[in-house]
């Protein structure tokens, strides 16, 4: 197994030389982003997953590369059904013929981690995700290789490559969960429970008794994959090919709004959300309902963080930089190197570019603002907590995704509108919370007892003119 790591490194070098050197000297097509995507696809395995993770980090990766990596596909040949059946029997104790009414031997989809087969249980169509027999070995080798790359970057002080250290570290941590399908099942169940009350999203139900570390069985969601729709739009400017994929009742703007609504409700009301909104993980269902699959990357937000993020979004739209700065500061991780004064000055400079000097309206899109803000926070060593960065990156990814199929949809304005709704709903919930109700009942009881006497004293003071004196003693209202 250890001999495989050097072989993987040699493969990496070979692909880089064969594809990269001719491009470097000739400067011909494919472009840099296309070449990078092609390199990762040729390397396959965990490098495809790494590329997909990089596509979700536009504050670190240039926009053209993010767009190219969004369509990154795991081009891996299927492994024989006999191997899949053997693994199912090892994991579940019985062969597929005894677990399912029928199972398609030809996989519906293949990837470096697993492949998916369609099956039926009591007439119910399900998706059976079976881990590739060599996945743990292959990913283990790549993880060791990534660790050596990080060591070299630090050892040789390759400062231009320091930006890679964070996503590579996240990738290593994420891979351990990706290889244990029980983690994905747990996240899918949590998000599925939350989706029960929302008609605009669907999460497949997990079949727990048929789920193990290397096998995952969920209900089958029958819909068009958003990635296929995006490719059809880009390949045929007339839109005929894309319209052929649209389900009944599909409207691009409504679908975009539903993606944003689901993201905000999950993040701000429940504190857990799908953080890997790659177009291959989104399905277009009837009536613009959004279907979600692949829950390997999930974001979590505490209640205080949710409140600050909502307030920060509203402050951004209204141009209140003081409030924006206070909210952002409350979300940052303690760091002795932090220079908050540098961040504040930089924020004021950016605001002059973000807002129209006459009308005060925003004149740049949401993605530009978020990328600027994260870049500034890095320069000032004033970084938000990791969960906050993940949320911001997810919102940026949504903006970049939506513009590809609903270019007229203003994600920033809609985010602000929905945040305002959520803030009002949060205030109503707080008002009706048990401690507030108890406080209200107690104060109401005191008012019933003391009210008549207080009103009598108020009338006497008013007749005596003492209320005007009290008003004069108050400080003037601030302008």
Question: What positions do the PLM features span?
Answer:
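Conserved beta3-strand ATP-binding lysine motif
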Residues: 129-131
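Helix-rich C-lobe and terminal helical cap/extension of kinase-like folds
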Residues: 2, 28-31, 212, 221-223, ...
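N-terminal accessory/targeting segments that precede structured cores
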Residues: 1-115, 119-122, 126, 137-172
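ATP-dependent phospho-/nucleotidyl transfer catalytic cores
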Residues: 70-77, 89, 136-141, 149-273, ...
